[in-house]
């Protein structure tokens, strides 16, 4: 009975092996000077089958995967060379689904009659696939996708000891996980960047776990013939620029070296054709001098009058292929040094393609040294090739990449200037019109649909003004010798002083726009490409990858400290509000829910300020034995209202930094809490609910120093967390803020230490700590 089962099992495995490729290589983690590298290392214990049958369905349903696992999961005995189904084992070896990576000895072969097993050394790709498969069975994630760091890395860290044993956990092990995802895309892993519009989401292409096959299991001759006739996917993951151990024969190495040399010679032929094309164009434009840019740049032609003929705008002929015949998804039109430019350039040209009437793609002009750099791994974004037919879109993106660079021009001597002026008067107009007609004739039809270019000049942000002033102050000698630098420094100082005093700044564009709008309203809307900033609005650019949520609350003209409207009565200025109907419910514009007037009314809490007030009252009536203190007013927790904003802004400018305006929080009052004593605001907290999918961000949380140590901040954090059930809550806290301990009590964990996070907000003379911790509360 056992022999028949064993024979049928071997036959079924041989049939399955016809559709998969064996591999004994996996990704391992290594560190060189603090950087995590991906090393291709052979595994002696076991190999993983990562290539599934491409002809069938992708099996994205969890139910189908569970049934597949119940049929396929078995353990291989090293001694009797049999596969033992998981249902026949006496005990469960792994609590993870699809995990059979053990050196197993069945009870019949063991000396003591007990099953023996030992964890095999897993590769990083096996670990990542096991983690993603088990996450998919749990039903979490978003449409089958999981976040790279928050889900996949968290799962691996939770089961680190069980999966990886006593392997050392380095400080950058998560970057190895990111490398596995990027390198394995799109064969084994699929990115959700295109579906969700943000990087970091990944899923398995085939929702199956990796399959272990012992090294000693041999294939039948018929199976090998089928495998040789059927094209299979190469499961060996290679990154251009990473070293591989010599595992191929000398013949294959020699063939690869010959192919590489042919590509190098081909690139030289292309550059030679480029020079010949330049000579032909030079002869056709007899009196128009042409200047070429250095090798490695796009071959633009610069005319004397500044007219630039950009070869990237010319349409390619039918002889120049726009799609690569190799497995590469598309041509490389990116600039040298970008991750996409490190891929190997395929052989694209034949003898007919070397005709110099049309320039070949710019990716072929790079030197061979540039193409053999180390592969750069993007931890969260998958390369998505553009549509095959949109040639103008590719060329347009190329132009955008090269736009900021300066074009090298030669300076003519004084003797050549008169001759050039004479030549300009006779020949320039005809030459420019000739080249303009030629370029318009060769324009592709899809270029009309391209988006208009942005403005050439953009206003300098407040933070950039601060950095510029700091650089000028660091070079007093150079500034003293240059009148222009002294004038610029004085302008920056005056602008900064006006902002500190709340005075308006002169903006010529704003004045001209106001005059045009005053004459005719349609004048301001004619120029759709140059949209200017509105009055009182600043531009804050961030240098870090994460989007600064705090930037949306910044204004260019902070109000003066103590500023109030002149029409406000003194009584309302004293009590803090002129809204008499405070006990009425409001409707949230964000969720359309009816919000009650109060979240909570606390009669028990006695902050230090209230204790001092009660002592003052009792001291006044200390000689009256019949005096009894009256009931104290409660602390009212309520949602933000428009009348709260001026006081909250002034408190933010006093305790945080200038220029904060929280008027935007009125759009989502559900995610706010304001604490009042009678009509005096003593604390507040705000949360942004729409930072990312499944993530909210606490932007501001403040308790007045005289009202602290009474549990007010604890209740505010609890309330904000409860308003976003099921979402992660994130925040930034200053490195010197003792509230870090309070956040840790709620379960917030430190994810990142951000240097100079508050540098763009604090004034230059501020002594506050400008570094911050980024905390996250996972749900």
UniProtKB/Swiss-Prot annotation:
Residues covered by the N-acetyltransferase domain: 635-779
Listed Pfam families: Acetyltransf_1 (PF00583)
Superkingdom of origin organism: Eukaryota
Low complexity bias locations: 314-334
Subcellular location: Nucleus; Cytoplasm
Region (Disordered): 1-34, 247-292, 314-345, 360-457
Keyword tags: Acetylation, Cytoplasm, Nucleus, Phosphoprotein
Major localization class: nucleus
One example GO MF annotation: histone acetyltransferase activity
Any one GO biological process: G2/M transition of mitotic cell cycle
Description of the deletion phenotype: Early embryonic lethality. Severe growth retardation, increased apoptosis, and alterations in the cell cycle.
GO cellular component, one term: ATAC complex
Disulfide linkage: none
Annotated Basic and acidic residues bias: 255-275, 402-423, 443-452
Modified residues (N6-acetyllysine): 230, 291
Residues modified as Phosphoserine: 4, 284, 413
Subunit (UniProt): Interacts with the LIM 1 domain of CSRP2. Component of the ADA2A-containing complex (ATAC), composed of CSRP2BP, KAT2A, TADA2L, TADA3L, ZZ3, MBIP, WDR5, YEATS2, CCDC101 and DR1. In the complex, it probably interacts directly with KAT2A, MBIP and WDR5.
Biological function: Component of the ATAC complex, a complex with histone acetyltransferase activity on histones H3 and H4. May function as a scaffold for the ATAC complex to promote ATAC complex stability. Has also weak histone acetyltransferase activity toward histone H4. Required for the normal progression through G1 and G2/M phases of the cell cycle.
UniProt protein name: Cysteine-rich protein 2-binding protein
Organism of origin: Mus musculus
Gene: Kat14
